């Protein structure tokens, strides 16, 4: 695991000397693209839900057309005139996990998904693809974005959520930018949130390879307020009004804590430079969740808070898989045994040598 995340860090956080290539194609701001992934186990589709612009770009400015990981889905941005790939990224989604549940056999649902892309200078074609566990295409769509489109909503220029930096090493373009959001904290509880966010930050940087590369990161705590204190626990019939509507019992797994309100997460972050997201839930219940290039969400007041936030960040930041089995995990049987998983910390031994042989 350490070797894999170190590789990702080196790929993302290199010197900005190659950034001039970025300026050939992109402005120093963000194109936020909202999609709805919908369907059921029999068929899936992708719908464009909205476009908006954010005032800064906090992602990578090098290796723009390279994928460090395959993920369960991919986005390719091409220059519309030449067809040249100018940016690509990968991700996983809660929707794809849901497709493995029994419910997906009989019910059609839609899930919000939001992605941050560098803002193009010229018209671009964006292609987004969802893959199944065998790496076959489940759903795909293409659409053209004109950067001067007057209907691209401008966000992040006002009404910015209160925030403060826990770790600020350099400007956003020279660091990996992590935002920690409050979930289930009222306005009166924000001091507690800042203390919890500081614990989360310190817990992550207590571990390698983050510890050695701490100076490559900025971490900001964002005080997104909730009406109610705490988060929803369906098995106890407790339902709260919170900033992001998070709840336990996702897919009927008691400790799986997620939110489907992805657009609300990104709205709360508009105007703050960010790339990776951690959400802290104000609860003593045990649980959490982490989705690659989407978010980490974890309980903040359970005794296992520190190791859990590190574990879940491994999912969302590093694309790592769980290395253990537990009952009612919908992902347990999703890995075909004749295909090597893209996650770097597990193996079916189909291509074991490429991953770990040099470590033995």
Where are the model-predicted features located?
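Sec/Tat signal peptide C-region and signal peptidase I cleavage site
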Residues: 15-19
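Fold-level signature of zinc-dependent metallopeptidase catalytic domains
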Residues: 150-211, 221-231, 250
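Active-site-proximal segments of metallohydrolase catalytic domains
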Residues: 216-292
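Sec-dependent N-terminal signal peptides
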Residues: 4-13
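Catalytic Zn2+-binding segment of zinc metalloproteases
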Residues: 313-329
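Beta-strand-enriched, solvent-exposed domains that form extended recognition/catalytic surfaces
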Residues: 25-151
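Short pre-active-site segment immediately N-terminal to the catalytic Zn-binding motif
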Residues: 190-193, 288-312
